[in-house]
């Protein structure tokens, strides 16, 4: 669910960066809620959510819905080295393989792979503009119950929206905010095994507390 300023924000970004090949997408969901180290209206990042986004035809034309890059030996060598060197999610390439084997097109992996293979960045608003209302047992990407979801993940689905102020304040340089990436990875326990263990334990205890035994043995 977007707030009202999401639409004029996307329109201005689409116009401003229409021909800038460095930029591949405009995000709306900011896991910081309000990014503490950003004095501008938005910043640039290599990590993003597809919960509310906009892009251009030039970007979509580069997508490989059949995951052809997985069959390109040189591209995979480059991609594996990039993921390792920049500390991206270790499960990214296995996730792409799983998605390819499913026979379905998953936008999150197709989009992110395209961005990495083309050295692109996403525009992230400094304030969260999107609510995700899709946490339930029938959800496509995050199935479960709100009450048995660990607190850090529950926060993501209950996060407030904040309107952006106009006119927008544009950043002077196109450079990635790597601190945002580190915070997002910590929140999601990517590359943080101890945090992941604690979240799994929290989920186990919540399932026991609410008698959701099917969630324990799934």
Regions found by a protein language model. Name each.
Residues 2-218:
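An acidic/histidine-cluster motif and surrounding catalytic segment
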């Amino acid at each position: 669910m977007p707030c009202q300023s999401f639409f004029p924000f996307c329109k201005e970004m689409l116009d401003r960066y229409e021909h800038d090949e460095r930029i591949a997408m405009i995000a709306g969901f900011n896991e910081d809620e309000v990014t503490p180290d950003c004095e501008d209206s938005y910043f640039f990042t290599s990590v993003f959510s597809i919960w509310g986004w906009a892009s251009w035809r030039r970007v979509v034309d580069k997508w490989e819905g059949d995951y052809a890059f997985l069959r390109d030996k040189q591209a995979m060598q480059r991609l594996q080295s990039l993921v390792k060197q920049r500390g991206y999610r270790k499960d990214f390439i296995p996730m792409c393989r799983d998605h390819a084997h499913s026979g379905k097109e998953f936008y999150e992996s197709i989009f992110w792979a395209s961005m990495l293979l083309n050295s692109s960045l996403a525009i992230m608003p400094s304030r969260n503009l999107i609510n995700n209302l899709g946490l339930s047992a029938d959800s496509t990407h995050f199935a479960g119950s709100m009450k048995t979801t660990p607190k850090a993940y529950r926060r993501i689905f209950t996060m407030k929206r904040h309107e952006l102020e106009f006119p927008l304040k544009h950043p002077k340089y196109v450079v990635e905010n790597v601190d945002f990436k580190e915070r997002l990875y910590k929140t999601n326990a990517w590359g943080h095994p101890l945090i992941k263990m604690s979240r799994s334990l929290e989920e186990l205890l919540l399932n026991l507390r609410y008698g959701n035994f099917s969630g324990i043995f799934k």
